[in-house]
C-alpha cells in the first residue's frame, strides 16, 4: 500500500541523513513524536508538511518517491478523483 511505502521511504532517507526521528521532528517545529508517528503508519503529513520534510532532507518531492511509489500514488489519485469528481 502507498502509505506503508511512504513510511518506509521516510525512515530510509532519515537514517541516511543520520538523524533521529525525535531530532528531525523538533527541527521541523513539530512534536517529538511527529516523524515516529509517520514512520509507524499512525499519521501522514499534510502536503505542506511533506514539502518541509523534503526540504529538511535536501531532496525534491519527486526524489522522495521511486517509480513504483509514483505509480501507486497516481493510481490512488485517479481512483480518488473518479470517486469524488474532478474539480477545476
Where on the chain are the PLM-derived regions?
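DNA major-groove recognition helix of helix-turn-helix/homeodomain DNA-binding modules
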Residues: 48-63
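Residue-level detection of the helix-turn-helix DNA-binding "recognition helix"
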Residues: 15, 29, 40-42, 69
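Helix-turn-helix DNA-binding elements, focusing on the entry/boundary residues of the two helices
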Residues: 10, 21, 32, 47-50
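Short, charged recognition helix plus adjacent turn
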Residues: 65-88
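A short, Lys/Arg-rich alpha-helix, primarily the initiator
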Residues: 1-16
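The alpha-helix within a helix-turn-helix
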Residues: 14, 25, 54
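Flexible coil/turn residues that form the inter-helical turn or adjacent wing/linker of helix-turn-helix
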Residues: 6, 17, 46, 57
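Short alpha-helical DNA-recognition segment
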Residues: 18-37
Amino acid at each position: 500500500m502507498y502509505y506503508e511505502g511512504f513510511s518506509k521511504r521516510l525512515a530510509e532517507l532519515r537514517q541516511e541523513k543520520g538523524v533521529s526521528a525525535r531530532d528531525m521532528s523538533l527541527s521541523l517545529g513539530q512534536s517529538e513524536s511527529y516523524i515516529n508517528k509517520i514512520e509507524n503508519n499512525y499519521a501522514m503529513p499534510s502536503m505542506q508538511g511533506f514539502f518541509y520534510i523534503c526540504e529538511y532532507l535536501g531532496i525534491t518531492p519527486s526524489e522522495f518517491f521511486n517509480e513504483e511509489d509514483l505509480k501507486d500514488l497516481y493510481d490512488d489519485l485517479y481512483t480518488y478523483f473518479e470517486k469524488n469528481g474532478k474539480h477545476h
